[in-house]
Amino acid sequence: MRKILKLKIGRDELVFETGFMAKQANGSVLATYGGSSVLATVCCSSNVREDLDFVPLSVEYNEKYYAAGKIPGGFIKREGKPKDKEILVSRLIDRPMRPLFDKRFGREIQVIPTTLATDQLNPPDIVGMNAAFTAVFLSDIPFNGPIAAVRMVYLNGKFIVNPSFEEIHDSDLDIVVAGSLNGITMVEGGANEVGEDILLSAIDGAHEYIKQICNAQKEFLDIVGKKEKLPLAFEEKIFEFKDELRDFVYADLKEACFVKGKLNRDKAITLLRNKSYEYFSSLEKLTDSNESLFHKAFDDFEKEIVRSSILNDNIRTDGRTPNEIRDIISEVDILSRTHGSALFTRGETQALAVTTLGTSIDEQIMDDIDGDKRLNFMLHYNFPPFSVGETGRLMTGRREIGHGHLAQRALESMVPGKNDFPYTIRVVSEVLESNGSSSMATVCAGSMSLMSAGVPVKGQVAGIAMGLISEGDKYVVLSDILGEEDHLGDMDFKVAGTKNGITGFQMDIKIENVTKDLMRDALEQARIGRIHILSIMNTVISNSRVGISKYAPKIVQLQIDIDKISLVIGSTGKTVKAITDEFEVKVQIEQNGKIILFGDDDFKMQKAKERIESIVREPKVGEIYEGTVKKINSFGAFIELTPAKEGFLSTRLKPRDSKYGSGRFGNSNRYSRFGGGGENIRGNAGLVRPPKLEEGQRIKVKIIDIDKFGKIDLEIVRDKDY
């Protein structure tokens, strides 16, 4: 039976419906906000595995073109592989949900939110998140919900919940917040140099709406009726010889956990693991059934040692204090042929960023259901296996897309608009080493690379990854976390920004008791760390270079009247093609009359600009052109001044010193219609014979008259008068 629940969030109602679509799934919910609707389903496999130490969850958010009344572009007229946007939304759904599933369930879980309709006003991603969370909460799969999500923006001094696309575009802060009744579990977004207090207020305000949606889900569960939960596949087991393992390895492990250097530390811990494994195997205390329990017990000891040292002694595995940042080395211009490059090294994390400048032809065209877009700024993040000393395939996965998107958001508010810098900008980050915070190293390297390339950015941007170790009311915030601290800690949040404020933010919280005071302390510690990193980066490069690389395409811009665009294009594009071929330039003509020329030769580009200016310029008496003889008749020749203008050159004999008084030609003909370019006729020194003209010949002419109908009369100009 169809069940419906409605609640007001922001300017529209959020509507949940179930019991009439996808009824064979373990759970299904159709969520609607405004005119945007998403159907979310959740299913689990019937196969049970007891050897899993993780939650086998997959989220496949997908958008259908029919939702916006569109047919896919290109040759293939159906939806294909997931777009970056769909992957990013899938990650937004996955991250707050994954910790709430029980590992002991032992079955593969798949959540599929499908966008069925969009009104081009309300973004469907938030609708999809709440549809997915509610579908799982209503299902028979064990889940520690409810959770919910909202988007908050800061616009004109006010916070707006679940804003429109236009409000998002115009805002100074745009974040997606997910959480439960007890607290926040995930935050992600970008900003235009906002302060920490604004971010905190946005998160705090978002939680109030999240609690409303969570309570609505509980009410909806009462309406629909609770399903009997599926049984857990296995009970959590403990290695039966855990105490003996502790006695055997704990003291040595405490030393191994604090060996300097990631590779050395990993090697020392692995040696102890192998030694312990061999010892217990020799005692015949290890079997196939408890081998995984042995490794879990060993990992628990390592986690206990590291967390205890941080909480009680303020000492981290690499010897740093909680707020200490690793040594930083920065370089720029290390690649000679690229348009801009920078190498940023922080401890054992290293990122090489390379900036390339292109033309408007290089813009990325986004064919999305919320409207076609053209991106002129892109950041691509690569994480090759050698960065962590491993082998593997070179491929772009969801992690790479997510990290690249975070770094791009951190930098894009500092990148100038197309009107100020009409280049397409692509930044590629190659992570060469990784031991935590590679996405924030990408932000730092990317910022310096943009400056190296001469992109007039508004300010230098740095990023830092923060962590948290807590126990009860006691907590320690960590600056510039290592990979193991991310894994063993209670919170991972990344903050990027300038000296003036935050530009990018991502936070994942594994515990529920994160207070506002704790978050304020963490953000302040992150701000201090960010300023420290910026000070080091600024010693290498603090402002954008004046001018761009000699290897980058050159740009010349000019503005013409809109009604003259057709003159520049010409019949069937003939005129603009001639300019392109003759001067070896690319010509971009915009609807507002702005013309952008791209090329490699400054001289040819200037000549192309002059040609366009001559095409659109209104002719005036006295101006000189180099024209082409197009047609000759018994009275004279028609001279093409520009592809859109012709003048007439009379070939009749004229007195060399004739004056035209008040006649049609006025007093502008100083010598003759031929400007002295003809020859005297024998026996008639006062008359001049016109020079011989041929069609296609290039000659210099001067405008001597323009009548009221726009007809242009010309005379030949001698070289010395030109």
UniProtKB/Swiss-Prot annotation:
| Disulphide linkage map | none
On whether Thylakoid is a keyword of this UniProt record, the answer is no
Where in the cell is the protein located? Cytoplasm
Output one GO MF annotation.
3'-5'-RNA exonuclease activity
Superkingdom to which the source organism belongs = Bacteria
The record's EC number reads 2.7.7.8
> What Pfam families does the entry give?
KH_1 (PF00013), PNPase (PF03726), RNase_PH (PF01138), RNase_PH_C (PF03725), S1 (PF00575)
Q: Which SMART domains match?
A: KH (SM00322), S1 (SM00316)
Domain S1 motif residues, every copy = 622-717
Which keywords accompany this UniProt record?
Answer: Cytoplasm, Magnesium, Metal-binding, Nucleotidyltransferase, RNA-binding, Transferase
Q: What is the protein named? A: Polyribonucleotide nucleotidyltransferase
Q: Give the originating organism.
A: Borreliella burgdorferi (strain ZS7) (Borrelia burgdorferi)
By which gene is this protein encoded? pnp
